[in-house]
Amino acid sequence: MFTNNFSQKQILGVSKDASESEIRKAYRQLTKQWHPDKNPGNEEAQEKFIEINKAHEVLSDPEQRKIYDAYGEEGLNGQPGGPGGGPGEGFPGGGFGFDPFGDIFDNIFGGRRRQNAVRRGPSMEQIVQIHLSSFYTGGSFTLEIPVKRTCSVCSGQGFNPKYSADKAIESCPVCGGSGFRVIEHMIAPGFRQQMRMPCNACNGNGRTIKHKCPRCKGERVAEVVESFDIKVPAGAPEGYRIGFRGKADEIPGMEAGDIIVILEAAGGDYGWTRKDNDLYRKETISVREALLGNWKRKIQKLDGSFMEVKRSAGEVVHPGETERVKNQGMPIYNLHKGKTTSAHGSAYIEWEVKFPKKLKGKFLKDLNNLFEKYDNEFDEL
């Protein structure tokens, strides 16, 4: 094919800085000149026509042209110097998909693969909800995460170990081992376009696994469950991230990415909720306690211990009043130093007063008389 010897712009006969209109004009002229209907039986003309269409497709597409201008033909093919890996490297399914058994083929058939730098696979984020009390006290727990690892049955080869490699792997029945398929479609009356595309049956490899591994089904990796020790420092903020380098899914031909565990609070414990380093809760008291005072109350903290709040006689609590108790909030974790400090945030208690639904009888009468008797004093409060 001409692509091996000429650049896309040389094929169309345009300059390096050709505009879109110049490219379209050259394309129209060349397709008329090299159209197979005008050159019956001329294989060179047919190949030239295919190359002209391919060159036009690249140069008329902004993204492909950007890659071509930056990296040339090798960039389009994903070879060294381009933005992607070559055929059979990366993720399965696309033009830049990884070759799930490329090294097997090379070992069998003597191929020499390009020595690209190993790319990293994607990282995995795992959100885990823990009790607020665990953020307060700190601690550790074991987390089980399903991950993909090199298949233990076929040792990552992809084929059934009962068979030898040369018997387990065959030429692709769809593309005949070429790794490509020629797709033809009509672009205008009397004009047909042929596109040479990587075969989707073998992902452009030209070979397929005939006898696949019963465990991984030819994927070379299989799912297993691994245990990870999660350590939570006291006072760790919500959204605290714990990383495990190179422990994400193993992908053939790539370096495994990271597992990132993100900690979130499952909900309030002992009635507490959190905002940064401070804790919040609501407490209900009676009308008598609100008006007369002279009481003590123990409130359970997130570590199971208790703190005491109290009111002296005659100290009134208003509905909705919020009380701040210093140094009773969350332990303060220093993200920069990566350790828990001795300082604590504050605890905030919002007081709710429980009023009776209705007053009646002697109680209503006596209370009314009391207010009338001390009406002036209430006005002065």
Swiss-Prot record:
Keywords: Chaperone, Endoplasmic reticulum, Metal-binding, Protein transport, Repeat, Transport, Zinc, Zinc-finger. One of its GO terms (biological process) is protein transport. It is found in: Endoplasmic reticulum. Residues 72-93 are annotated as: Disordered. Residues 5-74 form the J domain. Its main location: endoplasmic reticulum. SUPFAM superfamilies: Chaperone J-domain, DnaJ/Hsp40 cysteine-rich domain, HSP40/DnaJ peptide-binding domain. InterPro entries: DnaJ_C, DnaJ_domain, DnaJ_domain_CS, DNJA1/2-like, HSP40/DnaJ_pept-bd, HSP_DnaJ_Cys-rich_dom, HSP_DnaJ_Cys-rich_dom_sf, J_dom_sf. It comes from the Eukaryota. A zinc finger (CR-type) spans 138-225. CXXCXGXG motif repeats lie at residues 151-158, 172-179, 199-206, 213-220. One of its GO terms (molecular function) is protein-folding chaperone binding. Residues 78-93 have a biased composition (Gly residues). A motif (Prevents secretion from ER) lies at residues 378-381. GO terms for cellular component: cytoplasm; endoplasmic reticulum lumen. This is DnaJ-related protein spj1. The lineage of its organism: Eukaryota, Fungi, Dikarya, Ascomycota, Taphrinomycotina. The gene is spj1.
